[in-house]
Structures are given as structure tokens and as C-alpha cells.
Regions:
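Conserved short S/T/G-enriched processing/targeting/catalytic segments and their helical context
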Residues: 1-103, 127-166, 179, 190-224
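Conserved phosphate-donor
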Residues: 100-121, 172-188, 192
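Short, surface-exposed beta-strand-loop junctions and turns on beta-sheet-rich folds
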Residues: 17-20, 114, 121-124
């Protein structure tokens, strides 16, 4: 999956794998990491950062982690008013070559309600076109929707991004255990974090305590990795 987004300073993309340019290669003939304007008007090597990424004619100050398999998951933290998930949906609908085929993306909105985006190379469907999302967004596996919806909508205190990530990974091992984290206050992007099982257990226990008493979560197994 690839979404081109911009945090106002840097383009936070690991690499683009859904677009190919045969003329952008290294001395061994292998493709170089690069970014491309959505209308294909400009192409930049990954080492270049002095340009302004545009999504559907506007800046979207956001974070995402981009992976090249369906099992990678992403986070977006929207920072300013006016930049909402609708603009991402419109972008995806008009630039479908940026999307993985037959993928489902889970969105947690500012009210901790989950919504599902479905995309193929033929269409982009969304049931979320209302207010901007200000809370962390997780893109992941579609089968997580029902359970996570119960968890997030019954939380007495909203989960923070790290708790959301670890909870999702604990319930759905297919999401893996590594992730990227961007600190909005410091602007520091830490790549490929792999927490210890002890830290994961501690985070999960803290998150579960936030869940309202009317919801009885199942025990969360943490697989030793």
C-alpha cells in the first residue's frame, strides 16, 4: 500500500513500490527509491527533500508508514484542521495506482469509532465522509473490525497511539511486531521499533484497565518473539 503524505517538513515514506520507472536505476540496473507527484509531473529521488508533496491539490500534514506487503500497518496523525480523511479518499479514488489491490484499511476516528476503507485498482469505497480524523488511524486487516470496535468504543479513556498499536498486534499477530513511530511534538521519526515482550505486556495491561466495566475483554496472549 502506498499513500503519499506530507508532514509539513519531510515526506515520511519508506519507499514507493507500486510505481515503477525503468529509467530510475542504480549502476547495477536496480530501481532506486523515489517519490513521484501524483499527476506524474515530477519525480524525485528519495535523497531529495526540498520539495512540497501535494495530495489532491492540497497539503496533508500527516504521518504514515508505508510497507510493501498487505501485512504492514500504518498510522496517520492528522495535525491541523481542514486536512481530513476525505481528502485521502478523494486522492485514492483518483490515483488508484497508488493502492494495493483488494485491500482493506481500518480507520479509527476522533470518537474512537472504526470505519473500513476498501480499495481495489478499480474503485475506492469509503463509509466515512464526515468530520476530520484527529485520533490515531490504524490501517490493517479487515477481520479486526468487530473486535476492535468493541474495544475502542467502550474505552473509558482513549488509548494513546502506542497502546492502540500494541493492542492490535497482540490480538492479530498477522500484523507483526515491528512498527515506525513518529513523535509529533519532537518531530522525530523512529523506524523499525521492536518492543520486548515485557514492555508489550505492560502496555496491554495498562490499555485494558481503560476499557469500561461493561465490556469484558478476552485475555490478550503475547507470543514470545
Amino acid at each position: 500500500m502506498t499513500l503519499v503524505v506530507w508532514d509539513g517538513k519531510d515526506l515520511l515514506v519508506d519507499r514507493v513500490t507500486t510505481i515503477t520507472q525503468s529509467d530510475i536505476t542504480d549502476e547495477n540496473g536496480k530501481p532506486k527509491p523515489y517519490y513521484v507527484e501524483l499527476d506524474h509531473s515530477k519525480i524525485y529521488l528519495a535523497s531529495e527533500s526540498n520539495w512540497e508533496a501535494k495530495v489532491w491539490g492540497r497539503k496533508v500534514k500527516a504521518f504514515t508508514m508505508v510497507g510493501d506487503t498487505e501485512y504492514r500497518h500504518c498510522w496517520l496523525n492528522f495535525l491541523e484542521t481542514g486536512d481530513d480523511i476525505h481528502s485521502i479518499a478523494e486522492t485514492a479514488k483518483n490515483f488508484q495506482h497508488l493502492l494495493s489491490p483488494n485491500a482493506e484499511y481500518i480507520v479509527i476516528d476522533e470518537d474512537d469509532v472504526l470505519h473500513v476503507f476498501q480499495s481495489t485498482h478499480d474503485m475506492f469505497l469509503s463509509n466515512y465522509y464526515s468530520t476530520p480524523a484527529r485520533k490515531p488511524i490504524i490501517f490493517g486487516c479487515g477481520e479486526a473490525v468487530e473486535h476492535l470496535n468493541n474495544v475502542f468504543t467502550s474505552a473509558s479513556d482513549a488509548f494513546n497511539p502506542l497502546e492502540c498499536m500494541v493492542m492490535a498486534q497482540a490480538h492479530y499477530p498477522i500484523l507483526g511486531c515491528r512498527f515506525d513511530h513518529w513523535n509529533a511534538k519532537s518531530g522525530v521519526l523512529t523506524r523499525d521499533i521492536n518492543l520486548s515482550d515485557r514492555v508489550r505486556q505492560m502496555i496491554v495491561r495498562k490499555a485494558i484497565r481503560k476499557i469500561a466495566v461493561n465490556y469484558k475483554p478476552q485475555p490478550v496472549p503475547i507470543v514470545n518473539r
